[in-house]
């Protein structure tokens, strides 16, 4: 290896240190302890129940990263960081941080997952109530901006009834119904997830317009869901499962759609010939996090839609930076 190549590789090998630093700071609730104040090492050590020695090193590292401002013997949190990592902030992304940390633990088994071709201990989100709630919270923190972008792009003025498949915190239903007050929606997801869905629906005052249906999309032979939907959104569901399971799912869902109804698939589509780093990494994350999931191409998902009898299948560009939307119509 050349001398020029080693420094770059070394930087990649050490990249985990910055993420572990952030995970530790969040676990110790450092940003909430700081709030809008400027505190000393000793004050923060008491608040976090930590040693002054360790706290000083942690705070200096956070300052070196540019997340804190150090002046004399006091540390303060930058305003933009405080908004994201303080528990009292309505904009906080703490559930997302915890989800990413959980993912980092799964990635430590990457070599084993590559050997066996699937993830290890992948069912925790389904059965662990605390982990599921954190996951759903993260989906809302990450997804609401995407939901708003979809609501702004599509014209739903002639649509009345939305089926939000695997809707989690109902972010997409909420964003669409906020923009189109004549519409109503149904969120279909796992029973444990639906408990969290109902909390988000109530938080946004949508109880009279959004209902919920508990369903296991990949295991239930038939869905206890009414027909009569003229728009259906399948957002960030298909990457969780294998090709055969997804084909069967699309076929069952298409039967719930009215003639002329629109099916929107929101996914992290991948170009196998030239995948971006982000999509290649996310597909690999699905290897460690699921039994058979991965990112799929436009062509693969398009084949499932066509096999289910849908037509006018086409990608939608310009909403997101990377390929993310595919639309089809039921004839």
Where do the PLM segments sit?
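Alpha-helical subdomain
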Residues: 1-70, 156, 165-331
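Conserved Class I S-adenosyl-L-methionine-dependent methyltransferase catalytic core
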Residues: 8-27, 32-38, 47, 53-160
């Amino acid at each position: 290896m050349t001398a020029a190549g080693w420094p770059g590789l070394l930087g990649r090998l050490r990249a985990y240190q910055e993420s572990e630093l952030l995970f530790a700071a969040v676990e110790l609730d450092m940003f909430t302890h700081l709030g809008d104040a400027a505190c000393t090492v000793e004050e923060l050590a008491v608040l976090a129940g930590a040693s002054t020695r360790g706290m000083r090193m942690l705070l200096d590292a956070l300052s070196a990263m540019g997340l804190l401002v150090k002046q004399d013997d006091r540390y303060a949190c930058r305003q933009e960081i405080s908004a994201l990592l303080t528990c009292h902030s309505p904009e906080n992304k703490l559930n997302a941080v915890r989800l990413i940390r959980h993912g980092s633990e799964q990635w430590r088994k990457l070599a084993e997952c590559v050997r066996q071709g699937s993830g290890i201990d992948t069912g925790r989100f389904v059965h662990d109530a605390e982990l599921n709630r954190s996951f759903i919270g993260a989906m809302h923190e990450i997804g609401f901006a995407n939901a708003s972008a979809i609501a702004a792009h599509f014209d739903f003025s002639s649509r009345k009834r939305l089926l939000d498949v695997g809707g989690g915190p109902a972010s997409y239903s909420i964003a669409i119904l906020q923009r189109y007050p004549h519409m109503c929606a149904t969120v279909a997801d796992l029973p444990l997830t639906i408990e969290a869905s109902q909390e988000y629906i109530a938080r946004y005052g949508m109880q009279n317009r959004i209902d919920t249906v508990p369903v296991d999309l990949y295991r239930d032979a038939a869905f206890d869901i009414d027909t009569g939907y003229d728009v259906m959104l399948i957002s960030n569901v298909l990457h969780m499962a294998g090709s055969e399971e997804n084909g069967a799912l699309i076929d069952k869902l298409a039967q719930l759609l009215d003639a002329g109804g629109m099916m929107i698939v929101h996914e992290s589509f991948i170009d196998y010939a030239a995948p971006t780093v982000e999509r290649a990494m996310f597909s690999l994350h699905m290897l460690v996090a699921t039994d058979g999931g991965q990112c799929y191409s436009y062509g693969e998902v398009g084949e499932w839609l066509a096999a289910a009898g849908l037509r006018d299948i086409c990608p939608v560009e310009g909403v997101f930076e990377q390929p993310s939307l595919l639309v089809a119509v039921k004839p």
